[in-house]
Amino acid sequence: MAGIVHGILFCGLFGLCWAVTGSRIYPASEVTLLDSRSVQGELGWIASPLEGGWEEVSIMDEKNTPIRTYQVCNVMESSQNNWLRTDWIPRSGAQRVYVEIKFTLRDCNSLPGVMGTCKETFNLYYYESNNDKERFIRETQYVKIDTIAADESFTQVDIGDRIMKLNTEVRDVGPLSKKGFYLAFQDVGACIALVSVRVFYKKCPLTVRNLAQFPDTITGSDTSSLVEVRGSCVDNSEEKDVPKMYCGADGEWLVPIGNCLCNAGFEEHNGGCQACKVGYYKALSTDAACSKCPPHSYALREGSTSCTCDRGYFRADTDPASMPCTRPPSAPQNLISNVNETSVNLEWSPPQNSGGRPDVSYNLVCKRCGSDLTRCRPCGSGVHYSPQQNGLKTTKVSITDLQAHTNYTFEVWSINGVSKQNPGQDQAVSVTVTTNQAAPSTVTQIQPKDITRHSVSLTWPEPERPNGVILEYEVKYYEKDQNERTYRIVKTTSRSADIKGLNPLTAYVFHVRARTAAGYGEFSGPFEFTTNTVPSPMIGEGASPTVLLVSVAGSIVLVVILIAAFVISRRRSKYSKAKQEADEEKHLNQGVKTYVDPFTYEDPNQAVREFAKEIDASCIKIEKVIGVGEFGEVCSGRLKVPGKREIYVAIKTLKAGYTDKQRRDFLSEASIMGQFDHPNIIHLEGVVTKCKPVMIITEYMENGSLDAFLRKNDGRFTVIQLVGILRGIGSGMKYLSDMSYVHRDLAARNILVNSNLVCKVSDFGMSRVLEDDPEAAYTTRGGKIPIRWTAPEAIAYRKFTSASDVWSYGIVMWEVMSYGERPYWDMSNQDVIKAIEEGYRLPPPMDCPIALHQLMLDCWQKERSDRPKFGQIVSMLDKLIRNPNSLKRTGLDNSSRTNTTLLDPSSPEWSQVASVLDWLQAIKMERYKDNFTAAGYTSLEAVVHVNQDDLTRIGISSPSHQNKILSSVQGMRTQMQQIQGRMVPV
C-alpha cells in the first residue's frame, strides 16, 4: 500500500524521505500487546549480528514525536542472515494473536550491480516462552510464520518525486499456550525498513443486548471458532430465557439467544432498567413500558408495581392491576312485588350506579316477619326461588311455597366483585308483602277406619299446608276397573267420611282434596280398598222365607236396573256421567262461590261497587298507549297505592262522549273480573269511576296476547312447555266453569301472557258488543259470534254453555300447537260452518302429539254432552305432563278417527297451478325452487308424495317452512283424491 502522507521528513540511508502518521485509534475489538510507535525512547530489540545487520533509527511524526524504526540494506553481499528479535510479549490470555507490520522495500531492479545478491522478501518467526529474560537468539527455537513480500517497492524515481510506498502486512499466530512469545524478523539480503510493528489479539467487547450484559471475551484459538458466552441480566431485571451470544473470530458478537425482562416496577431505558415514575406502575416482569395508574388509583413512589385505590374504591382479588378501581353498586331500583296467593314475583331495575363494573348480580334475602313486622327470621329451606336465590343475572325472580297470610320482607342486594370489601345497606332495596289465602296442599294419606260389605269409613290427616281455614273436604271414589270414567263425590266438613252403597267384594279407589276460601287443592294420590263379603244384618234371623225371597228378588231387579243404567250411560258419552253427573253438578254448587251476572242488578253501579275496588286517580300514572280497545285506549302505567309497592298495570280507558249504556257495558267487565281470584284469570286491581276518564285497572301482562306471542316465538318451545300453557288455560277455565260462568269468547287472542309465561284468561266482555272484532259474525245480544272458535250449537241456537267453551278450548289448543296459526286458515265463515256440519275437523298441527289432537277432537264432538268437562281436561293434561313419553307419538292415525280432517286452504286449487314453480309462488315459498329442481321434483305429481324427511334432505330446515309446505302438499293430495272421487266425509 502506497500513499503520500504529509508530515515530518526523515532522510535515511537511501536518501528517501518518509512521511509517517502519528498515533492511531484502533477498533474496540483489538487489544494491542505491542506497538513500536507508542514506545518512548529506544526499542532495544536484539539484533544478530550485533553489527552490520538491523539498525535502529528514529524518525519524527507530524506531532514531532520520535518513532523508532529498524532498517537493513545489505544487498551487495550474498548469504545474508540478519535477525531482529522483539522483547518478550505477554500473551494476556489470547490463544491467537495478530502481527501488523508496516515497512518499505527497495526495488532490486533500481539498484545497479546487485542482481545476484538483492532480495525483495524477509521472513517472520515466533517463539513461545515462559521466560521473559532470554538474551540470545537461538534460531532453531523459532517457528516460521510466513515470508513477507512487499506489494509495492520504491525506486530511485520515487525518491526524486518524494513518494514513499509503505506496505502493511498482517499475519496471525496461534494457537498459543505459554505465557508469552518473541517475534523475530530474518533479513536474507533485502533493502528494508520496518516502520512499525504492532501485535494484538481480538476480542468481542463488552456489550448489552436484550437487557443482558456480555463481558469482554477473547476470541477462540481458530479463525473459524465461536466462543459461547452467557450473559448476565442488567440491574433490576430477570431472565426470561437464558441470554447467550457467540463471540466470532473477528471480534463480532453473533446469534443473540434469550433475553432479560425488567422487573415489576421498572421499564427499559437506554439498555438498562429504570424505575417507573411517580403516578406510573408496572405489575409484571414484561417488556412493556410503565403504565399510568388507572382511574381512581395512584402511586406515590417510584418503582411501583401497582397503584393504590382511592378512598371508597376497591380492587377485587381477580382484577388485573390495569383495571380501574371500582366500588360496590348502588341498590336496585323500582322494586315491584306481585303477590299471587302464596307466591311472589319480584321485578326491579338495575342499580343506577354499577360501581364501574360489568359483573353486577343480585342476591335475594327472604325474611318471615310477625304481624307487627318485627321479629323477622330467615325463611328457611322450604321456600323455593326461580331461577335461583343468589347470583341472579336477571332482574326478576319468582318465590313459591310461602305460607298463607304471612308477612314477608324480601331484600334484593346488588352485588359485584368488590361488594365483599365494603358491604353496606345502601346496596339493597326491600319490600314487605303479605301473602294471600291459597288453596291447601295435598292430603298425603287416607286410612280405612271400618270396611263392610257395602260401606267404607275413611279418615285422613289435615294437609301439611292448609293455607287457611279448611272449609270442607271432597272425597272422589270409583270402582277400580272403571278407571275414573264414572265416579262419585261425597263432601264433608270433617276429616272423615262414611262411603255407603258400595258393591261387595269390589276394589274401590279413593281420592281426597281440601277446600279453603281460595278454592280446592289438588286431589290426593289414589288409595285402594276392597269391600268384604261378610253380609250385613239386613234381614233378621227370624225372617220368614217369604220375606227372604222378596228381598232376593228385589235385589236382582235392582242389579238389572243398575246394569241397564250403566250401559245407557256408557253409550251416551265416554266423558258424561249421565243423570248422576247432573246430580253431581247440583251437589258441587252447594257451598261454592257462584258468578253473579252484573246485568241482573237494577242499578249496574251497585255491581261495580260490590265487586270492584275504587282507586284514586292520583295513584295511577299512565306511561304509554299500547293498543286501542272497543271503548277507548289501552295503556300501560304504574299504580302506587299508599302503603304498598308501586306495580306495573294495564289501564283501559273509556273514550270521551260515551253514552250511559256504553259506560255500563264498559264497567260490567270490571264487575265480572272482580268476582274472580285465580292464578290463571286476569286480576282486577280496581276501577276509577269518580273522575274522567273512567278506567279499569288490571295487572300488566308483559308478553301480550298469546296468539301474537306464539307467532313471535315460532318453534322455540318444547311440547311439554306448550302442554303447560294449555294446562294453565284449562285450569282457569275450570275455575270459571265451577263458578257457572260461560266465557263465550275463548281464543288465543284473549289469553294474556306475563313475563313468567303464565297464561291468564281475559276479555270478559262477550256479553257486550263485539262489532269491532274482525272474527265476529252473527249478532247475539247486541254482539257478534267469533265463528271459528264457537261451537255449532252456539252458532245455530245461541246456546252458550261450559260445553261450548270446551269447543272453543279445543280451538285454542290447535292455536297453541300451531304457534298462533289462524284456525281454518283463509276459509270464509260460511265455509267453516258448512265444513263442521259435514263432519270435518281441523288436522293436527305439525309435530302435534296424537294424544293432544285426540283431546282436540273430543272437544269438538258434535253432541255437547259428549265433550269432556274442564276438570277432566286438566286431569288429562296433568297425566300427559307426568308421562312425557305419551307426547312423543305424532302424526295422524286415520284408523282411529271418526272424522275426516279439513282441507288445507293454504293449498292453491289443483286446477290453478301448472308447475312446481307456480305452486311454490302461490304459497310464497318460491325461494326453494332450486332445491326442488335439484332434487328431481319437476312435476306436481312428484311433489304430492314429499314428506318431512324429503324436505330436510333437500335443504329445507325451517320447521315453519316445512309445516307450510307439507300442509299445502296434504291439501293438494286431498284435492286429487276428491277429484278422483275417493274422499267422503264421515
Swiss-Prot record:
Annotated Protein kinase domain ranges read: 620-881
TM ranges: 548-569
What sequence ranges are listed for the domain Eph LBD? 30-209
Q: Which SUPFAM superfamilies does the UniProt entry name for this protein?
A: Fibronectin type III, Galactose-binding domain-like, Growth factor receptor domain, Protein kinase-like (PK-like), SAM/Pointed domain
Where primarily located?
membrane
* Job description of the protein: Receptor tyrosine kinase which binds membrane-bound ephrin family ligands residing on adjacent cells, leading to contact-dependent bidirectional signaling into neighboring cells. The signaling pathway downstream of the receptor is referred to as forward signaling while the signaling pathway downstream of the ephrin ligand is referred to as reverse signaling. Highly promiscuous, it has the unique property among Eph receptors to bind and to be physiologically activated by both GPI-anchored ephrin-A and transmembrane ephrin-B ligands including EFNA1 and EFNB3.
Active site as annotated: 745
Per the UniProt entry, the signal peptide is 1-20
Any Gene Ontology biological process = cell adhesion
Please name the source species. Xenopus laevis
The family this protein is said to belong to: Belongs to the protein kinase superfamily. Tyr protein kinase family. Ephrin receptor subfamily.
Tell me the InterPro entries matching this sequence: Eph_TM, EphA4_rcpt_lig-bd, EphA4_SAM, Ephrin_rcpt_lig-bd_dom, Ephrin_rcpt_TKs, FN3_dom, FN3_sf, Galactose-bd-like_sf
Q: Name one Pfam family in it.
A: EphA2_TM
Q: Name one GO cellular component term.
A: dendrite
The SAM domain covers 911-975
Name listed for the protein in its UniProt record: Ephrin type-A receptor 4-A
The organism's taxonomic lineage, starting at the top:
Eukaryota, Metazoa, Chordata, Craniata, Vertebrata
Instruction: Specify which residues bind ATP according to the UniProt entry for this protein.
Output: 626-634, 652
As recorded in Swiss-Prot or TrEMBL, the protein's gene is named epha4-a
Q: Which residues are glycosylated?
A: 340, 407
GO MF term list:
ATP binding; GPI-linked ephrin receptor activity; transmembrane-ephrin receptor activity
Its recorded reaction(s) are: L-tyrosyl-[protein] + ATP = O-phospho-L-tyrosyl-[protein] + ADP + H(+)
* Enzyme Commission number(s) from the entry: 2.7.10.1
